[in-house]
């Protein structure tokens, strides 16, 4: 039971991280003037892509424990 609860909570966390980073990246790509305090748009976008990739990798690894 605890195993399932922990795995589910981790899955929710990683999916939320993906959603948050994807939403922010979408804003950067569609409305870059709205993010005036970040002059390094490419660096910031790269960080967001990295967050998405990391969370997706964690989800992939998590699937191994769900077997």
Question: What spans do the regions from the language model cover?
Answer:
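Extended, charge-rich alpha-helical interface modules
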Residues: 2-67
